Amino acid sequence: TEIEKPAYPVIDFHMHMGKMLLGESYETKYDTKEYVRELQDAGVVCAVNMDGYFGKDLEKMQKKQEGFEEMFFNFMQLDFSAYDDPDFCDKTKKVIEDSCMRGCRGIKLWKDLSLWERDKYGRPIRTDDPRFDIFYDTAAKLHIPVLMHVADPAAFFTPKSEKNERWEELDVCPEWDFSDHEKYMSFEELMEMQENTVRSHP
């Protein structure tokens, strides 16, 4: 049976409208009105955009969404490049508050935080870092969710071989291979980190 319309209104909870996948010139790559029409034709009543970012990037995204503010909910992203600065926590807290005031509905933390981001000593930046408590507490105070992408499929953390169930994916995308545990945290470590984070901030 061909189903042309969903039985219920659809909320697309994970979409990308901006530079993360489309590059800095994303605003020239699609027409927002046409995009909304296609979403509505598919039964989508609203969508959560993970490319809200903050500051001027957020302003740029909101301009791209003008006229369709009720259709899109933006989640902000945070910048960890100044992680080692003494005022990093205070500045990031202000970014969260400002982005929320400008309309962001949540925070998105990407897997690069613990897989690629490093402090000045070369150690992975962890989501259960006590310094991050202020971010989670601020989000709770503002009544916005924190969406975390922690790790990837467990097979990405084991060596690529004929016994690896994701061998074909790893062959096509070798950058998804996190099996070097001298370079990356193990899958088990990442899961423990996630449990610690949720336990501390239910």
Where are these regions (language model features)?
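A short helix-to-beta-strand connector/capping loop
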Residues: P6-A7, E70-M71, P202
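Short Gly/charged-rich anion-binding patches and loops
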Residues: E34, K94, I134, E192-M193
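Single, functionally critical "micro-switch" positions that shape active/binding sites
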Residues: I11-F13, M148, P202
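An N-terminally biased module of ancient metal coordination in phosphate/nucleic-acid-related enzymes
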Residues: T1-G67, D90
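A conditional alpha-helix N-cap/helix-loop micro-motif detector
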Residues: S25-K29, F54, D85-C89, I125-D129, ...
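Active-site gating/metal-coordination segments in enzymes
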Residues: L58-E182
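Generic structural signal for hydrophobic
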Residues: E38-L39, S99, A139, T197
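Conserved N-terminal glycine/acidic-rich loop preference
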Residues: C173, H181-H201
